[in-house]
Amino acid sequence: RRCFITPNVRSERCPPGQEVCFTKTXDG
């Protein structure tokens, strides 16, 4: 599971077909 740092965005939803999560801390 990879996390990318996004500005003012904190979502634990992953797009279909990819295990990518968007978190503000990028930890998880």
Swiss-Prot record:
Gene3D superfamilies from the UniProt entry: CD59
Record flagged with keyword Cell membrane: no
Distribution of this protein across tissues and organs: Expressed by the venom gland.
Subcellular location, record wording: Secreted
Sections of the chain in a coiled coil: none
One Gene Ontology cellular component annotation held by this UniProt entry: extracellular region
GO molecular function, one term: toxin activity
Residue pairs linked by disulfide bridges in the UniProt entry: C3-C21
Domain of life according to the entry: Eukaryota
Keywords, sorted A to Z: Calcium channel impairing toxin, Calcium-activated potassium channel impairing toxin, Disulfide bond, Ion channel impairing toxin, Neurotoxin, Potassium channel impairing toxin, Secreted, Toxin, Voltage-gated calcium channel impairing toxin
Free-text function comment from the UniProt entry: The heterotrimer blocks the voltage-dependent L-type calcium channels (Cav1/CACNA1) from the heart, and the small conductance calcium-activated potassium channels (KCa2/KCNN) in the chromaffin cells and in the brain. Is very toxic to mice.
Other noteworthy facts: Is composed of 65-68 amino acid residues.
Subunit structure: Heterotrimer composed of this alpha-neurotoxin-like peptide of 8 kDa, a neurotoxic phospholipase of 16 kDa (AC Q7LZG2) and a serine protease inhibitor of 7 kDa (AC B7S4N9) at an approximate stoichiometry of 1:1:4; non-covalently linked.
Record family assignment: Belongs to the three-finger toxin family. Long-chain subfamily. Type II alpha-neurotoxin sub-subfamily.
Protein name per UniProt: Taicatoxin, alpha-neurotoxin-like component
Gene source species: Oxyuranus scutellatus scutellatus
